[in-house]
Amino acid sequence: MEWHCCEFEHLSAVDLYAILRARNAVLVVEDAHTHLDIDGKDAGALHVYATQRQGDAAEVAAYARILPGDDIDPDVVIDKVLTSEACRDDDTLEHLLERALTAAHAAWPDAALRTHVPAARQAFYKQFGFRKAYGPFLHQGAPFVGMIRPAQRAAGALRQLLSRAVSAQRDRNEEARADGRAHGRLAADSGANR
């Protein structure tokens, strides 16, 4: 299996055709959804996919599309997640999600990630840091839930900021205690000197 991650303009015509064929085979035919898969959002997305050789042609074994956030909806969206029928009993989906999360974090480190998944797959996505945000709701007649994975860098930045604030206060308290011991008095903020 050969893994790829690229923007739309870097997809070859052969790879694009294989991706659209796989998306239609799984998301339209297998899932019995009557919708237009080509929705005009592919040009601005990252495409994470795996190909396998079948004779002379390469077929898409796994695929996920990653849409960037914007001013109205800042969350990055992972959608069109699929694996071919031949890759459903192995760890291909796990590898796909790991690669999609890595690509999304590299491209948009400060953004939360959102996805819509079949309600029965919630536990699987929780393994990757997603939590239920809303739903269930019906999508093409099947129950789905919206899941979100909080931004990691923003959370890390907040932890750093809080840690610095606590450390700075602790340092000021230590300095006041040391100053008080050196001069034989309590720190001014203790209230005992009043």
PLM features per residue range, with description:
Residues 49, 57-69, 74-82:
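Conserved beta-strand in the GNAT
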Residues 43, 55-56, 71-73, 140, ...:
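Short strand-connecting beta-turns/loops that link adjacent beta-strands
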Residues 97, 119, 138-143, 177:
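Short glycine/proline-centered loop/turn elements that form peptide/ligand docking sites
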Residues 68-78, 88, 109, 138-141:
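A conserved beta-turn-beta hairpin within the catalytic core of GNAT-like acetyltransferases
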Residues 83, 88-103:
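Conserved acetyl-CoA-binding loop-helix of GNAT-fold acetyltransferases
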Residues 126, 131-148:
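Conserved catalytic-core motifs of GNAT/GCN5-like acyltransferases
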Residues 1-44, 51-59, 160-163, 172-173, ...:
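Short amphipathic alpha-helix that is part of the acyltransferase structural core
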Residues 104-118:
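Conserved GNAT acetyl-CoA-binding A-motif
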